[in-house]
């Protein structure tokens, strides 16, 4: 490992330590939203839960200084502009399946248990969505201009039909850049 790689690892470690509480706070914000598919409503094609989760994720991303867009409630995204309009998209989703039985606590109230975040969506896929945003935030804070635009996509219908992803192929969302 050369000195540049060692320095980068130190920067990442420092960022993770500094961001730990924010990561947990933002995960809790999303996990605490019951984003199970519901009845369609204006701006909420998969129900109000997925809509609220999408709005919350976009608010978190906007607070990090990322460019955000809500594509009619189907999908949203947060961009970290790069040196070119080419994009690398990191796909996440904010909808969850119904909680089912076997929970010892409220599945829509994230808690920490033995050092682990517990709640519906912590692993699939709200937790990874938050971590992906923090990766973009790391590059932004470091002043790194990637050779491409980094786009974090937030789906709202992965668990029950993937109709959100279809929007990417039928609209300008895939080509739109800030």
Residue ranges and their predicted role:
Residues 2-120, 141-146:
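Acidic/His- and Gly-rich active-site-bordering loop/insert found
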Residues 28, 58, 130-137, 166:
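Predominant activation on well-ordered alpha-helical scaffold segments within soluble catalytic domains
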Residues 77, 97, 159-161, 177:
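Flexible, glycine-rich phosphate/dinucleotide-binding loops
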Residues 83, 137, 175-176:
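Charged, amphipathic alpha-helical interaction segments
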Residues 90, 115-159:
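Alpha-helical metal-binding/catalytic segments enriched in His/Glu/Asp
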Residues 102, 162-166:
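Short acidic, glycine/serine/threonine-rich loops at helix termini
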Residues 169-178:
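Single conserved hydrophobic/aromatic residue that forms the stacking wall/gate
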């Amino acid at each position: 490992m050369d000195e540049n790689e060692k320095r980068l690892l130190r920067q990442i470690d420092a960022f993770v330590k500094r961001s730990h509480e924010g990561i947990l706070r933002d995960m809790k914000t999303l996990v605490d939203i019951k984003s199970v598919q519901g009845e369609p409503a204006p701006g909420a094609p998969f129900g109000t839960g997925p809509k609220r989760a999408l709005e919350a994720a976009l608010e978190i991303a906007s607070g990090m200084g990322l460019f955000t867009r809500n594509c009619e409630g189907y999908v949203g995204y947060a961009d970290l502009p790069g040196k070119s309009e080419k994009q690398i998209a990191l796909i996440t989703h904010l909808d969850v399946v119904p909680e089912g039985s076997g929970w010892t606590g409220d599945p829509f109230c994230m808690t920490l248990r033995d050092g682990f975040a517990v709640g519906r969506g912590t692993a699939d896929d709200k937790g990874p969505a938050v971590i992906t945003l923090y990766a973009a935030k790391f590059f932004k804070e470091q002043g790194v201009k990637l050779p491409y635009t980094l786009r974090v996509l937030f789906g709202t219908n992965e668990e029950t039909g993937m109709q959100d992803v279809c929007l990417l192929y039928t609209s300008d969302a895939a080509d739109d850049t800030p």
